[in-house]
């Protein structure tokens, strides 16, 4: 018989740097999860992506055991890294902070394809381009 799920916790944690301090500790403490067990396992699984923010979905069962799924980093984080900028534009329609080739947007779309709600790579690329536009990053051919 399958275990009963008691809670699903969604967090965004920096890869390889999960620790019991907020936001991880309080979120998992309320669910009754072994916080250090999660931190060690998460850091081990994400050590190759150090520095990126990784969304994680933790499924907590009634016996307080857990499993978790790591997702791809948010599109905004990948776009900022690709454009080599620290911060997006406060006024994306007026101030463009960077230019990014369409091929780079397509690479990001390919890496995020499993997490995007898109039928094909073209639709995924358009989603990434829309995110870039809202951040003040201009997509050029």
From Swiss-Prot:
Record's keyword annotation contains Nucleus:
no
Cross-referenced Pfam families, in alphabetical order?
Answer: Ribosomal_L11, Ribosomal_L11_N
Q: Which domain of life is it from?
A: Bacteria
PTM description: One or more lysine residues are methylated.
Record's PROSITE patterns? RIBOSOMAL_L11
Q: Which CDD domains match?
A: Ribosomal_L11
Keywords assigned by UniProt, alphabetized: Methylation, Ribonucleoprotein, Ribosomal protein, RNA-binding, rRNA-binding
Instruction: Read off the InterPro entries from this record.
Output: Ribosomal_uL11, Ribosomal_uL11_bac-typ, Ribosomal_uL11_C, Ribosomal_uL11_C_sf, Ribosomal_uL11_CS, Ribosomal_uL11_N, Ribosomal_uL11_N_sf
An annotated GO BP: translation
Q: Does the keyword Transmembrane helix apply?
A: no
Which GO cellular component terms are attached?
Answer: cytosolic large ribosomal subunit
Q: Name one GO molecular function term.
A: large ribosomal subunit rRNA binding
Quaternary arrangement and interactors, per the entry? Part of the ribosomal stalk of the 50S ribosomal subunit. Interacts with L10 and the large rRNA to form the base of the stalk. L10 forms an elongated spine to which L12 dimers bind in a sequential fashion forming a multimeric L10(L12)X complex.
State the similarity comment. Belongs to the universal ribosomal protein uL11 family.
This chain belongs to which protein, by name?
Answer: Large ribosomal subunit protein uL11
Q: Which organism is it from?
A: Selenomonas ruminantium
